[in-house]
From Swiss-Prot:
Extracellular side: 39-204
Positions annotated with a glycan in the UniProt record: 73, 101, 167
Superkingdom classification of source: Eukaryota
Described purpose of this protein according to its UniProt entry: Cell death receptor specific for IGFBP3, may mediate caspase-8-dependent apoptosis upon ligand binding.
Identification of the protein by name: Insulin-like growth factor-binding protein 3 receptor
Keywords: Apoptosis, Cell membrane, Glycoprotein, Membrane, Receptor, Signal, Transmembrane, Transmembrane helix
Pfam families in UniProt: TMEM219 (PF14940)
Binding partners and assembly: Interacts with IGFBP3. Interacts with CASP8.
Tissue-wise expression: Widely expressed in normal tissues but suppressed in prostate and breast tumor.
Region forming the signal peptide: 1-38
Amino acid sequence: MGNCQAGHNLHLCLAHHPPLVCATLILLLLGLSGLGLGSFLLTHRTGLRSPDIPQDWVSFLRSFGQLTLCPRNGTVTGKWRGSHVVGLLTTLNFGDGPDRNKTRTFQATVLGSQMGLKGSSAGQLVLITARVTTERTAGTCLYFSAVPGILPSSQPPISCSEEGAGNATLSPRMGEECVSVWSHEGLVLTKLLTSEELALCGSRLLVLGSFLLLFCGLLCCVTAMCFHPRRESHWSRTRL
């Protein structure tokens, strides 16, 4: 009997208080959205990318980290006239050879396909110049020079000074000592959330979503137990 009365009270509340019903539904949807988004962030801490951007700087630089570069010798021929130059600050390691205490310049021209580019950009050339100094800096500056529309259009990583980027030169032959470029796995190259920050956001969204769902449940229980329809007065019944 009590369950029937509680259900009847809840039905009357739904019928006579539409604003309260709308507010409850909004809270319910927010709670479900928080649970869904929080679960997604906890299960997809890596690999989050916009489907509208075919190539981003993270994958671009990781492809670059698989290449091999050689020191440039003193002979210079010609100038590189790439109209689009981007200077990026990275923490790439250029090896620990005998010349690691000297300032070195590494330079290479690679096809877009070697950098993970596809379509018409795969056949375009990209000039990459890196100047490794002996100073204890926060990272290594890389200069990418190419025609417009080749380099990634996503938000760039932390940029560095572009001084000397326009003076990049091509060498007719490379030195004998080449090094492999590599980066630590999971290196954060762009201003994105780390896996720890994603986990924190996901857990907080789960807590918020659970709280909203519990609040909606508590609101329904209180309404079912305490809501009583207003009795019609004798004067109202007489007028009817």
